[in-house]
Curated annotation (Swiss-Prot):
Keywords for this protein: ATP-binding, DNA-binding, Metal-binding, Nucleotide-binding, Repressor, Transcription, Transcription regulation, Zinc, Zinc-finger
Gene behind the chain: nrdR
Protein's recorded name: Transcriptional repressor NrdR
Family assignment from sequence similarity: Belongs to the NrdR family.
Taxonomic classification: Bacteria, Bacillati, Bacillota, Bacilli, Bacillales
Zinc finger (unnamed): 3-34
Length: 153
């Protein structure tokens, strides 16, 4: 590993520990030449996950897009950024655990909505209204009735 301070190639590992639920390793290193200390992260390179959009176009999965949508849905709601990041990680993990290389955007939206339903009902309705593109007020009211029904159970 090349030292970021002096570019010397010789470094030694002082400490290693798993992070990110065991998916990465954090290493504390020291340069053998200038004794500068720095941190590196090592993780398995995952194969790209491709999202198939409604129009049939394809793009690489981007968890930041999910996070932005969640932040928008949770505006002025008592939901922390940490919770939203956990939802984003959970969604990505669930998709990767499917073991497929392509996933439809509809499936991603449904998974996000299920996660959001457990966190905040108002944010769930906001997200659902954009994601499902309710055609009229009656469809929106039916969704609200479903939420109320599930709360009673």
């Amino acid at each position: 590993m090349r030292c970021p301070s002096c570019s010397h190639n010789g470094t030694r590992v002082l400490d290693s520990r798993p992070v990110d639920e065991g998916r990465s390793i954090r290493r504390r290193r020291e340069c053998e030449s200038c004794l500068s200390r720095f941190t590196t992260f090592e993780r398995v390179e995952e194969s790209p996950l491709i999202v198939v959009k409604k129009e049939g176009t394809r793009e690489e999965f981007n968890k930041e897009k999910i996070l932005r949508g969640l932040i928008k849905a949770c505006e002025k709601r008592p939901v922390s950024l940490r919770q939203l990041e956990e939802v984003t990680q959970s969604v990505e993990r669930e998709l990767r655990n499917l073991g497929i290389s392509e996933v439809k955007s509809d499936m991603i939206g449904e998974i996000v909505m299920e996660e959001l339903r457990d966190i905040d009902d108002v944010a769930y309705v906001r997200f659902a209204s954009v994601y499902r593109q309710f055609k009229d007020l009656n469809v929106f009211i039916e969704e609200l009735k479903d939420i109320l029904q599930k709360e009673r159970e």
